[in-house]
């Protein structure tokens, strides 16, 4: 079947893993405590704090305790949705203030533009929140790449290593799974996507291969047919 849509991971695929771990996460860890204290009374933030309380089983946790839980989750690299949402809010402020610029590999930015010009629909699936995804591409070093994408998916669609998540995403995109190409640097994610019927392509930026999947080192090497 002809590929009509591309679903891409971010971390290690379109963007350097180091950007997330060496820039974004430390920025959020530094600024999140004060952000939560300043905005805890706002409905959007309060809802996420309640979600942290529910997830941690500490229904009566005060703001400082919730902050401690969030910082612990960051240290553990937990993929908790309320943490991702709050991080996204902190990053949004950083992008607005000009303190952050999203990293996107030049080869990825060029390929995404070319694919869009060819009429392919582009989507993102990342463990980072949808808001954070939009910020990375919308405020990137390569300019505003946001208009290239038709949709974004995060952990609200399910874990990235479960095939049901990819079936759900294919349904949301509205195409047969076999017409969607998924790009990732993680074998378990590629396996899950393949199990759901998607086409898969591994991206190994440092070279090598991703077991059981065709693999490239750069978006410049990707041929979409």
Swiss-Prot record:
Cofactor: Mg(2+)
EC number: 3.1.3.77
GO molecular function: 2,3-diketo-5-methylthiopentyl-1-phosphate enolase activity; 2-hydroxy-3-keto-5-methylthiopentenyl-1-phosphate phosphatase activity; acireductone synthase activity; magnesium ion binding
Pathway annotation: Amino-acid biosynthesis; L-methionine biosynthesis via salvage pathway; L-methionine from S-methyl-5-thio-alpha-D-ribose 1-phosphate: step 3/6; Amino-acid biosynthesis; L-methionine biosynthesis via salvage pathway; L-methionine from S-methyl-5-thio-alpha-D-ribose 1-phosphate: step 4/6
GO terms of biological process kind: L-methionine salvage from methylthioadenosine
Main EC class the enzyme belongs to: hydrolase
Family matches, as Pfam families: Hydrolase (PF00702)
Keyword vocabulary terms for this entry: Amino-acid biosynthesis, Hydrolase, Magnesium, Metal-binding, Methionine biosynthesis
Keyword Metal-binding in annotation: yes
Annotated InterPro entries: Enolase-ppase_E1 (IPR023943), HAD-like_sf (IPR036412), HAD-SF_hydro_IA (IPR006439), HAD_sf (IPR023214)
CDD domains found in the cross-reference section: HAD_EP
Superkingdom as given in the UniProt entry: Bacteria
Co-factor remark: Binds 1 Mg(2+) ion per subunit.
Reaction catalyzed: 5-methylsulfanyl-2,3-dioxopentyl phosphate + H2O = 1,2-dihydroxy-5-(methylsulfanyl)pent-1-en-3-one + phosphate
Statement: the UniProt record of this protein carries the keyword Transmembrane helix: no
Quaternary structure, from the entry: Monomer.
Family in the record: Belongs to the HAD-like hydrolase superfamily. MasA/MtnC family.
HAMAP family in UniProt: Salvage_MtnC (MF_01681)
Function: Bifunctional enzyme that catalyzes the enolization of 2,3-diketo-5-methylthiopentyl-1-phosphate (DK-MTP-1-P) into the intermediate 2-hydroxy-3-keto-5-methylthiopentenyl-1-phosphate (HK-MTPenyl-1-P), which is then dephosphorylated to form the acireductone 1,2-dihydroxy-3-keto-5-methylthiopentene (DHK-MTPene).
Protein name, entry field: Enolase-phosphatase E1
UniProt organism field: Pseudomonas paraeruginosa (strain DSM 24068 / PA7)
């Amino acid at each position: 079947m002809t590929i009509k849509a591309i679903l891409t991971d971010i971390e290690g695929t379109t963007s350097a893993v180091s950007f997330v771990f060496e820039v974004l996460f430390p920025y959020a860890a530094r600024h999140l405590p004060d952000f939560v204290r300043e905005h805890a009374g706002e409905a959007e933030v309060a809802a996420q704090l309640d979600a942290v309380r529910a997830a941690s089983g500490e229904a009566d946790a005060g703001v400082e305790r919730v902050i401690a839980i969030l910082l612990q989750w960051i240290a553990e690299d937990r993929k908790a949705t309320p943490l991702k949402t709050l991080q996204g809010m902190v990053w949004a402020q950083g992008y607005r203030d000009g303190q952050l610029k999203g990293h996107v590999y030049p080869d990825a930015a060029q390929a995404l533009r070319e694919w869009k010009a060819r009429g392919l629909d582009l989507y993102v699936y990342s463990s980072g929140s949808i808001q954070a995804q939009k910020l990375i591409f919308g405020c990137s070093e390569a300019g505003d790449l946001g208009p290239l994408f038709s949709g974004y998916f995060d952990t609200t669609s399910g874990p990235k290593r479960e095939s049901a998540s990819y079936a759900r995403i294919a349904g949301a995109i509205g195409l047969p799974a076999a017409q969607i190409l998924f790009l990732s640097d993680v074998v378990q994610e590629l396996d899950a996507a393949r199990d759901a019927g998607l086409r898969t392509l591994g991206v190994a930026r440092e070279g090598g291969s991703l077991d059981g999947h065709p693999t490239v080192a750069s978006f410049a090497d990707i041929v979409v047919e």
